[in-house]
Swiss-Prot record:
SUPFAM superfamilies referenced in this protein's UniProt entry, alphabetically: Acid proteases (SSF50630)
CDD domains xrefs: retropepsin_like (cd00303)
Protein name (record): Uncharacterized protein 7
Species whose genome carries this gene: Soybean chlorotic mottle virus
InterPro entries given in the database record: Aspartic_peptidase_AS, Peptidase_aspartic_dom_sf
GO biological process terms, semicolon-separated: proteolysis
GO-annotated molecular function: aspartic-type endopeptidase activity
Length: 148
């Protein structure tokens, strides 16, 4: 991968999960990218805190085969690493993760996993960067209970 790629550090608890910083409503927020999740979601408490509206309801199938009804979904714009804006439709959920991006998000990118890093690249589209020193700050914040 070249230096125009986003680099995400693997979660200490799950090899399929990676962390990145994004900006929503002019606030820097930690985002979890899960290569094992089929759909992306955002917590209802995050929407309420940041005054983001939601709409529509849908049922989704979970990794274990069960179905979960998500009452709403919302369209938000995330600025990844200060360079690229990505518009995403996220389902609203009561899960503890504030923002989780799944394979529905990853389908928009060429991605590669090497060691403990996930590299995202939009090929012909504008690219964005994340400096490795910021990754370690994210991990430290995420390992502190209620740190985010």
């Amino acid at each position: 991968m070249n230096s125009d790629s986003v680099i995400c550090l693997a979660s200490l608890s799950n090899y399929c999960q990676y962390h990145i910083l994004g900006i929503i409503n002019n606030r820097i927020v930690p985002i979890l990218i899960d290569t094992g999740a089929s759909w992306s979601h955002i917590s209802a408490s995050f929407l309420k805190t940041h005054q983001i509206k939601n709409c529509e309801e849908k049922s989704v199938r979970r990794f274990d085969g069960t179905t979960k009804k998500l009452n709403k979904k919302t369209l938000i714009e995330i600025d990844l690493s200060g360079i690229q804006n990505v518009k995403l439709e996220l389902y609203v959920d009561e899960e503890p993760n504030k923002i989780l991006l799944g394979t529905d998000f990853l389908e928009n990118f060429y991605f590669k996993i090497e060691s403990d890093c996930l590299f995202l690249n939009q090929n012909q589209h504008p690219r964005f960067k994340l400096h490795e020193d910021k990754i370690f700050e994210i991990i430290q914040d995420l390992t502190i209970p209620n740190g985010i």
